[in-house]
Amino acid sequence: MNVVQVPTIVRNLAIQFHRSMICAFAFISIWSTGAFAQTSHPHNASPQAQTDDQKNNQSALIKIVRDSTERFQDVAEAVREGYTLQFGCVSGPDQGAMGLHFVNSDLVSRGIIDPTRPQIVIYEPTGDGHLKLIGVDFLLIASVWDADKTHTGPPQLMGQLFHFWESPNRFGLPAFYTLHIWAWKENPNGAFVNWHPNVSCQSFGGN
């Protein structure tokens, strides 16, 4: 498997950070919405008991994500398809980390939920300077989603309710809906929570 070292990625993509985010969000209102999705509470909740149907749906969704993103185990392929590094390495004070987010600004601007086309692919920096694919993130700008009258409520994907993230936020984005899926690294707190307790940004050499 081909890999791209972290310092190389940072040098190649740092300039694109502000440009891509400005292009993707220039037309979007920064005002918060009154949506009733799950809030972005900083701590992970304990996994809840699930029915067999829920478990089957979750397994099916994870499989779709894995099948659709397997090629991105080589981060160079993600870059070729329009994903660029944003936000540095996202970590939390006491709940682990989210890792490195490679964002496809075109997919974000479209605002479409497609399990085979995540807006973000997530990597963890490793001790040897490489990147390991660990999951994906589906991200929708809240004001755009809520303005569409065909939507009867907050976004869901195969039964998984998106989390609502208010503005202002650490990412400098308008309020948004997000759904992390830890398809490539098992999360003891569940496959669809925001934070991964076993992900670390310690090996990240960028800013």
Predicted features by range, described:
Residues T39-N207:
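Primary mode marks residue(s) on the alpha4-beta5-alpha5 output face of response regulator receiver
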Residues A35-A37:
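Boundary at the C-terminal end of the N-terminal hydrophobic targeting segment
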Residues M1-F17:
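N-terminal secretory signal peptides that target proteins for export/translocation
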